[in-house]
A protein has these predicted regions:
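Residue-level recognition of short, well-ordered coil/turn positions
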Residues: 125, 141-142
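Unchanged
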Residues: 44-71, 76-133
Length: 142
């Protein structure tokens, strides 16, 4: 899947394992955006990474999972959540149960879990922009 963007600040990726999403509980620290809320893997771009390279590196750093590009299902460019006037990339991918079972949780965040789509979309403990982006995907693939 080729994503045509050369200037972006970072990526988030919604990874579906069956009918659930892999989520990470952010640290409960003041001074970080959205403390103590559930979010999706991803983060800031390093160097001239492609969107997939950025997301894959972040997933490996956060969860110890190696992604391959054939896991990608969908992508869309959005305004950055952190940097006004900049863009970020949102990806949707699939994760196998074997990959989920092999997670080695890194040092960012308090924990991880598979969350149902309904809970992810309705919870007030999930980053709202990420809820909107998952909703966009679900609307488009109906």
């Amino acid at each position: 899947m080729e994503i045509e963007i050369s200037d972006f600040t970072g990526c988030k990726i919604a990874l579906f394992c069956g009918d659930k999403l892999l989520t990470i509980l952010r640290d409960n620290k003041s001074g970080i955006p959205f403390p103590n809320t559930w979010e999706l893997p991803g983060g800031g771009r390093e160097g001239d990474e492609s969107p997939f390279e950025c997301a894959a590196r972040e997933v490996y750093e956060e969860l110890g999972i190696h992604l391959t590009e054939d896991c990608l299902l969908w992508s869309k460019v959005y305004p950055s959540m952190l940097f006004e006037g900049k863009e970020s990339v949102f990806l949707i991918g699939k994760l196998t149960q074997e990959q989920f079972d092999s997670i080695v949780f890194g040092d960012e965040g308090q924990g991880y879990k598979l969350m149902s789509i309904d809970e992810f979309l309705s919870s007030d403990k999930v980053v709202p922009q990420l809820q909107d982006r998952v909703r966009d995907y679900l609307e488009e693939v109906k």
